């Protein structure tokens, strides 16, 4: 109809993918955003609580009047580190990654340390490679697969009117890259999409350049992109 697909110039399925690729590329180009670096991702004071170079769109809790109560606040729900105002630390209702998803993240992917490995859970000291505000005693309480992605505001574990004040990610540029890759698989072919996915992963997420998409058709390419969306945007 004139108010729907016709108005967008879409007459076939592939037109949808062409538009998706075009809009995703426009968002990348016009936002001025860059994928998060490893240091931004793992920053103990600002990691996933303060907008940075990759965030296109956010919501903000900037005052205690906006906050109301930690119990139903964003940071109170998703953070694992505070025993004063998070459901994880206070109520033991930790937000965890599923084991089946975690097991699909290779060691070469630096995002893997976002979650507590089963072999590291319960240790008396914080194992190497993790970014956390906790000391050994706090670490020992974390169950396997607990997330360390969302740090309290300003890295404050004790004052809810500081730790629960934060920015909330609604859209990051990484999602635009992944939308673009999935879309061009339909318009330019699987090999073209694989090349862009390989380049993205090795430039921004792998430490050794070893990522290589093994997709052989549209379905397996979509599965590869979906896996990266699940890892990259976990909890968002």
Sequence positions of predicted segments:
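Short, cationic low-complexity segments
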Residues: 78-94
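Periplasmic/extracellular electron-transfer cofactor-ligation site
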Residues: 29, 97-98
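Acidic/polar-rich alpha-helix caps and helix-coil junctions
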Residues: 1-71, 103-236
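Domain-scale macromolecular recognition modules
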Residues: 74-76
